[in-house]
UniProtKB/Swiss-Prot annotation:
Family stated for the protein in its record: Belongs to the universal ribosomal protein uL13 family.
InterPro entries: Ribosomal_uL13, Ribosomal_uL13_bac-type, Ribosomal_uL13_CS, Ribosomal_uL13_sf
Pfam family, one: Ribosomal_L13
Gene Ontology cellular-component annotations: cytosolic large ribosomal subunit
CDD domains: Ribosomal_L13
Role: This protein is one of the early assembly proteins of the 50S ribosomal subunit, although it is not seen to bind rRNA by itself. It is important during the early stages of 50S assembly.
Provenance organism: Pseudomonas putida (strain W619)
Assembly behavior: Part of the 50S ribosomal subunit.
Alphabetically ordered keywords of this record: Ribonucleoprotein, Ribosomal protein
One of the GO BP terms on file: translation
Upper classification of the organism: Bacteria, Pseudomonadati, Pseudomonadota, Gammaproteobacteria, Pseudomonadales
Listed name of the protein: Large ribosomal subunit protein uL13
UniProt KW Ribonucleoprotein keyword: yes
Sample GO molecular function, one term: mRNA binding
Gene: rplM
């Protein structure tokens, strides 16, 4: 029997909606990253993007354990000398709640062109409303 490898043109992708309200950041991000890669499917192939589309709602209600809400730092750099910026979890969740989940998931995906394609299938929204009702996403319990 020959080994099966998925072809990019035959991959069937589904849309799922995940409610992040009350979920722990890391546990939610690992499951999302796994589904974006397609590792939950029997036809998973490492060099082919077999993952599904994931829509995350209520990103502003995500939680972290312990003192991470004040201690967890996010860093960015402008590229200029002395241009490092830092912001903690509390301030980032108030300023841009989508970025918290996006950053966590992006760090769990491959750092190559295939990983960037997988990351583009992630849609994160701060509130409960999202513009993807036409795709008829199924609810995913995590």
């Amino acid at each position: 029997m020959k080994t099966f490898t998925a072809k990019p043109e035959t991959v069937k992708r589904e849309w799922f909606v995940v409610d992040a309200a009350g979920q722990t950041l890391g546990r939610l991000a690992t499951e999302i990253a796994s589904r974006l890669r397609g590792k939950h499917k029997p036809e998973y192939t490492p060099h082919v993007d077999t993952g599904d589309y994931i829509v995350v709602i209520n990103a502003e209600q995500i939680r972290v354990t312990g003192a991470k809400s004040s201690d967890k730092m996010y860093y960015s750099h402008s590229g200029f000398p002395g241009g490092i910026k830092e912001i903690n979890f509390e301030k980032l969740i108030a300023k841009a709640p989508e970025r918290v989940i996006e950053t966590a998931v992006k760090g769990m995906l491959p750092k190559n062109p295939l990983g960037r394609d997988m990351y583009r299938k992630l849609k994160v929204y701060a509130g409960a409303a999202h513009p993807h009702t036409a795709q008829q996403p199924q609810e995913l319990k995590i």
